[in-house]
Amino acid sequence: MAKNRALFAEYEPKNCKDVFGVINTRQITALMFHDEMADLFDFLGLRGFKRMHEYQYLAESAEHRTLKRYYLNHHGMLLPDEEIEPVDVIPDDWYQYNRMDVTPAVRKQAVQKAMEQYKEWECGTKELYEKCAAYLMAWQKIADFDKVNELVKDVDMELKYLERLCIELKSVEYSSDYIAGLQDSYHEKYKEKFKDIGVSIC
């Protein structure tokens, strides 16, 4: 993921199609990321965090469809799906184990690593979207800028709550008991948020 951050620093789109193309690729990769994160937390028996990523997967899937339809309706062209690199959130050797094999020590370490990966992912996404928005503004593509700026604000809000969660978990040194105690409230919170999934398509 650090590799992706470095690539974003050098990213220089030539036109609107380049901008929407790289966002399209990032969104597809994000769906893969949240899908694996949901599987990871489900395997760890942390159903609240699992549902959090399931919600992000479904919400961002709708967001992705909206972006593709926006580009087609306003630019009259299809966005090609570029080659996508795997995200590899779940260690390869985990696939040979049963979820009952997970020890408290492994669970604690896995949660800490996953939260760090999640934060790094969203920071990278925000950085990319902000750069794309800046190019569109410089080109005076205001309608396109507004569309991408919606994505910037969405990921910025996601980061706000994620950073609070990371600080909360760090303050208790990723206590297994504390993490377990959060699961019911997170499960119910995102169960309710599932009802609100929907985006405006123009």
What are these language model-derived features?
Residues 1-202:
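Iron-associated oxidoreductase/ferritin-like identity signal
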